[in-house]
Amino acid sequence: MAHVKELSAESLLELKNIEGLRINTDLRERHLYESDMGELPSMPKRLVGKTTPAAIVQPQNENEVIQVVAWANKYSVPIIPRAAASSGYGGVVPVPGSVVMELVHFNKIIHMDTDKKTVTVEPGIVWKDLEFKLNAAGLAVRMMPTSAPASTVGGWLAQGGGAGFGSYQYGLFEQNVESATVITPDGSKITLAAKDLSLVSGAMGTTGIITSITLRLRALEKHTAFGIEAKTPAQVQEILEQIDLKGLPLWHAGFMNPTAARLKNRVPPKTHHGHPLPKPVLPESYILLLACDESRAASVEKKLAPIVKDAGAVMLPQDITEHEWEDRFNPMKIKRIGPSLVPAEVIVPLNRIAEVFEQMEETVKPPVLVEATMVSSKHIVLLCLIPHDARKLTFNLAFTLSLSILKLAKRYGGRAYASGLYLAQEANQVHRTRISQWLNFKREKDAKNLFNPRKLSGIPLMKMMIGTALAFEPMVRIMGNRIKPQLRENWKAKNGLPGDVVWYAYSCARCGYCRNVCELYGGKGWESTSPRGKWAYLRRVAEGREKFDQEMTNNFLKCTTCERCDFTCQLDLPIEPSWAVMRGELVNSGKQMTFPAFELMAASAGKEKNIWANFAEKRDEWVPEDLRPKIKDKAEIAYFPGCTASFVEKDIAAASARLLDAAGVEFTYLGKDEACCGIPMLVAGRWDVFEKIMRHNIRKMKEHGVKTVIASCPACWLTWHTYYPQWAKKLGIEYDFEAKHYSEVISEKLARGEMKFTHPVNMKLTFHDSCHIGRAGGIYEPPRDMLKAIPGVELVEMEHNRENGLCCGSVLTRISEPDPLSNKLGRMKLEEVAACGADACVALCPCCQFQMRVSADANGMDIPVKDLAAVAAKGLGIELPDYTPYVLEMWAVFDKVITLMQVPNMAKLMTLLIPRMMDALPAPLRGMMKMAKVPGLDRMMARMMPPMMPLLMPILMPKVMPDMLREVEKMIEMPDFMKKQMPDLMPKTMENMLPHVLPEIAVLVTPAMIQYVKTKQLPSIRIF
C-alpha cells in the first residue's frame, strides 16, 4: 500500500484531548473521504496525487471548531471543510496529512423569525430538511439547489454558483443571504453582512469555516408546474424570451434537451422488491418545466398558452409534467446506464441559447444530456452530462469533451459555472475581483495556507494540461468524438463481487441522497456506515484495493433494512436488496460470520423452529381457550402469528386472532408445526437455514389447504408476500399463496359495515409505520383506518410518517453489539412520539414494539407502546395483559448473551476454561505445554499457541462444553426453557462461530494460558 501521511503522535494526542470532538483515524474510513462526487479519469487523477486525509473530525459546536483551528495552526496541519460533499469540483478533496473537518453535526435551526421571514441555521443543515421544518411553520426557502435532498446550506454558499430552483424569481443564492458567521484561519469569529459575503461565497472554505447563515424566506405557497414540448432550441429560446417580455411571474424555469429525454427513457425503471414500477415515456423533444405560485397559476396559464402556440410548441400531458416535477431533484439518472459521467457545467446568455445547442450538436458527437436552469430572465445554467465508463482508458479522451463544451460556451458569451480544484484555471473568469480579495485575506490571516489549500491556486501540472487541451481542443475533440458509450447495464463479477453489485457501485452518483436518510448513518455518523460509503467501499473491493473482513461485513449486516435509501436514491438503485445479496455472498458462503447471537437463533430455529430458544411444543400457548374450538384443522385462510407474538408479546397473537374471529373470518393455524418465517436468518445471511424453514412452512400450509396467509408481524407478512415467492421461483417450488396483514382484512370489514368497534378507548394515539409493511409493502392506511374507527381514539401523526417514517432501529442493529445503536435510534423515534403529544405509540410489529419498549427503558423515557390489535380488541371490550415487563425480562437475558458473545468476552470465558482445556489436551501436548516453565521458551509458546488453537479446538470443545455451559449459567440467569436447551444449542453455535473468531480469541487467551502453566493461577475475570 502506498505511504499515507499521518499525524504525529503528539499532535494526535492533543487533538483527541479536545473535549466532545468526534475523531476518526481509521485508514479505511479515511479512504472514503478522499473525494467529492466528481470522478476524474486516470490521467488527471495522477496529477492530483494522494488525497487520503490523516484524520476526520466532526465538531459539534463553534468552540470545538475554534479549538481545532488553533490546533491546526500550532501543528501546521491543513484543514479541509466538508459538509455533504455533493459537488463535483474538487472543493473538499484533501491534501496529504490534512484533517477533514466534517460539519454534519451543524445541522440545526438556530432561530426562525416568522414576522421578518428569516431563519438562521447551522451550515450543515440539508436543504430538504430545512424546507420540511419551515413548511411546518408556514414558511419556505426562496430557492434551493437541484441537489436539495443531500446538499447543505453552508456548502452552497461556500461552493458558489448558487443557481437552482427559485433562481428565476430570486436570482443567485448569495443574493438571498442576510448574513453569515465565520471562523477565520486565525481562529477569530466574525459576522459578515450581506454586502460582505464575497469573502466566503464561492471561496470553498479557503477564507473561513461558516458556522451559521441567516436566510431570507418566503411565505409557504405550493407551486404549480407547467410542462412544454418544443422541437427546436429556437423554439425554447423564443418561449423563454417571451415569458420574460410578457412578465410572467415564474418561480422556476428550466428545460432538458431531447437527448436527456431519450436517455431517461432508456434508464431501467425503479423496482420494488424486484418488481418494475411504471413510469411515463418522455417525448424525445426539448421539455420545458416551469413553476409558479399556486395563486398565480391561472394567470400564468392564460398568458403562457399563446406564447407556446405562437412558438409552434405544445403543452405536455399533465401526467408527464407531474412526473418530471416530482423527479426534478434527480438529474443524474442516466449514470445508471453509464456507469460514469463526463460533466460540464456552464452559464450562457439566454439570447444565444439556440446557437449554443445547434453548435453543441455539431461539435460533440457522443450523447450529451443537458439539464438547464434559468438564473434570471437573462442567463441560464447548462448542466451537461456525457455517459461513459470511468474504468476504461478511453474515459480520458471522452473527458476532454467537457472542455469542448466549455470553449463553446465561451464563444457565445458564457463561462464556467464554478471553479475549484479541477477548474482552477477558470477561477479569474468565474470569480473576477474576488480572487484577489481572497488571496489578500489569506496572506493576512492564513500565511501557512492551511485552510483548504490548492482550491484557489489549483495544481500547476493540471492547469497546464487543461490549458494545452483547450489550445488544441479541435484536435483533442476528434479523439473524444470517436468514443461510443454502450448506454446499458453490463453486469460482470469482479474480485468476488456479483456483477450487479459491481455495476451499481460504479453507477452510484455519490450524491449523498441516501446518506441523509440512512438510519445507521444517522446513529453512527461516519461515511462507511452510509449507503454511499458502502458503494465506495465496494468499488475499492472490485479494484483490489480493499478486502472484506469481519468488521466491514458487520457494517453491511447492521443495516436496519428500513429501505429509506431505496426511496430516495436518484438513480433508483436497489440498495437494500444489494446489501441482502452481499449478506449471502459474505455469510452464507462461509467467508465471514453473522453476528454471534444469530448463530444461537439459527441453532434454535433448526431445533425448535423459533428464534427465542423456546420449545416448539409451547408455540400455541398464546391461543385463548375459548378460541381453540373455532380454529379449523383445514381452511383456505391461515393465521400466522410468528415467533415474537407466539413466545414473547402474546397479546399481539391473541388480539389478532380475536379480531379475525370477531370479523367472521374462519381460519386455520399451524400451531406447534409453525416455524419462524425465517426473515431473521435471511437478513443475517444464513440462507441455508432460511431455505429449510421456508420449505417447511410452505409444505405445512399446503397440508392445511391454505390459499391466503394472514400475518400480524410485518416481517412475516413480507416473507410470505415477497421473499417466499422469490425463493420458491428460484428453487422450483410451487407457490400460490396470497399474503395479507390482518389490518387489511379488518379495515375492509369496517368499510363494508361488517364489523364495528363498540367500546370507547379514550386516548390520543400516534401510529408507527413499520418498515417491513410500510415502505416494503405500501400498507399505510388500513392500520390508521382501524384506529379512526375506534370510539374515543384521537389519532395524531408524528413529524415523519408513512413513506418518510423513521425506522424503530431494530432488526440486526439491536443484535449486533452491546450498548446497541438501537437505543439511540429508538430514542430518536420516541422523541417524535413525545413531540406530537400522544398518550402512547401504537405499532403493529412485534419487533418494533419490542425495540421501542426496550429503548424507552434504556433511555428512561416513560412512553407506553401499545399493540394495534390489542388496542382494537379493547375497542371490542376485550382487555389483554401488557407484556412490557416480560419483554424487558427477555431482553435482559439476550442482552447478556450478546455481550458474552463478543470476542473479548468469549476470550474471558475461554480463560476460565483453561484448566479443563489443559486436562483435555492429548498427553504429548500437555507435556509440551509444561515447557513454558523453562525460561525463554514461554515466548516461543506465545508464538505457537495462536496458530495451534484453531487446530486443537475441535478436539477440545466437546470435552470442555459441559464446563462452558456451567460457566454461562453462572453468568446469565436464563429462563428454564432456554437453560434446558443450551446443551443442544451452544455446541452448534460454537461450531459455526469459533472458526471465524478463534484466531482473535487465541491471541487474547495465550498469555493467561502460559501464566496458568507457570503458576496454576488464572487472572481475575469479570464480564458482567
Which residues fall in each region the model found?
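N-terminal flexible segment immediately upstream of the FAD-binding catalytic core
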Residues: 1-70, 87-117, 262-267, 272, ...
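C-terminal substrate-recognition/cap domain of FAD-linked oxidoreductases
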Residues: 24-25, 29-42, 237-404, 408, ...
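A glycine- and small-aliphatic-rich helix-loop capping segment at beta-alpha/alpha-beta transitions
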Residues: 91-107, 135-139, 161-174, 213-220, ...
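FAD-binding subdomain of flavoenzyme oxidoreductases
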Residues: 108-112, 119-255, 451
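Activity-critical C-terminal alpha-helical subdomain
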Residues: 422-488
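Ferredoxin-type iron-sulfur electron-transfer modules in oxidoreductases and energy-metabolism complexes
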Residues: 478-505, 521-608, 692, 696, ...
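Iron-sulfur-cluster electron-transfer modules
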Residues: 502-505, 535-728, 734, 749, ...
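Cofactor-cradling patches in redox/metallo enzymes
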Residues: 572, 644-737, 772-789, 794-901
